[in-house]
Curated annotation (Swiss-Prot):
UniProt-recorded name of the protein: UPF0194 membrane protein YbhG
Chief localisation class: periplasm
Entry-linked HAMAP family: UPF0194 (MF_01304)
Matching PANTHER family: EFFLUX SYSTEM COMPONENT YKNX-RELATED, UPF0194 MEMBRANE PROTEIN YBHG
Top-rank taxon, per record: Bacteria
Entry GO terms, CC: periplasmic space
Cellular localization per UniProt: Periplasm
Pfam family, one: HlyD_D23
Keywords for this protein: Coiled coil, Periplasm, Signal
Signal peptide range: 1-16
Coiled coil region boundaries: 108-209
Similarity-based family: Belongs to the UPF0194 family.
Amino acid sequence: MMKKTVVIGLAVVVLAAVVAGGYWWYQSRQDNGLTLYGNVDIRTVNLSFRVGGRVESLAVDEGDAIKAGQVLGELDHKPYEIALMQAKAGVSVAQAQYDLMLAGYRDEEIAQAAAAVKQAQAAYDYAQNFYNRQQGLWKSRTISANDLENARSSRDQAQATLKSAQDKLRQYRSGNREQDIAQAKASLEQAQAQLAQAELNLQDSTLIAPSDGTLLTRAVEPGTVLNEGGTVFTVSLTRPVWVRAYVDERNLDQAQPGRKVLLYTDGRPDKPYHGQIGFVSPTAEFTPKTVETPDLRTDLVYRLRIVVTDADDALRQGMPVTVQFGDEAGHE
């Protein structure tokens, strides 16, 4: 009987040891796994035309899924098409002027300028000789001082005409001045810039989706006259999907960039999403009121941004998420 009692006692001791060991192992596993609480953070963007005008058409409505590169809406293109035509004409004029400056003067123009110099030289010689004769007559008191002054004036005018013709011939032979060529080139570049701006304005009168997403709001309707930058749509981006969470300083070493984690939602507690820490704030901040934690050991925390690598449409903006660290979550 005593032997049986001893055996039973030993069995109880062994069983208690097994239970205690199992509990210790379970607790150690729990202690090694950090748990944080955060919320889904999906970026939204306000889409607008970069230029103003009358809304011609809108191709999507609230709730529609959109794809990157999809045409979402258009303004009335006519004003921008007219501006583009004017800019092209301006480039043509400036290009022609610049080409003329580079080419210089034709042989025919140089010959005409040389002939003008000869004609001006002959006129000057005649005026100079006439003045000389009038000067002699004035000395002999044959003509008045007024007659002499008229002869001098005619001589001076002929001299000025000759100098102008000589300067023009010299310019024709040497070509256009570098300053004039540079000015013509600058005018051409300005016209080309205006053309590029006109092309861009016409392009921006069509609103293109920058990325995949879901249309949340449609702020205007066709016929609305918009100023540039006026919001037309608000879009929730499909990617990336992040979880915003906070970690205290004591556990900061476990939350390093690249660390993989599991993300649990109330809707699928047995099928976690997978995430990877992409950003850890370099500065501490006071615990936000929205943070849900079972035990905050400090008022200062560090913000985490966790990228959800297998996100789907079930994740919604602001949805609460449990972030589980541990060996099962894996590391980089």
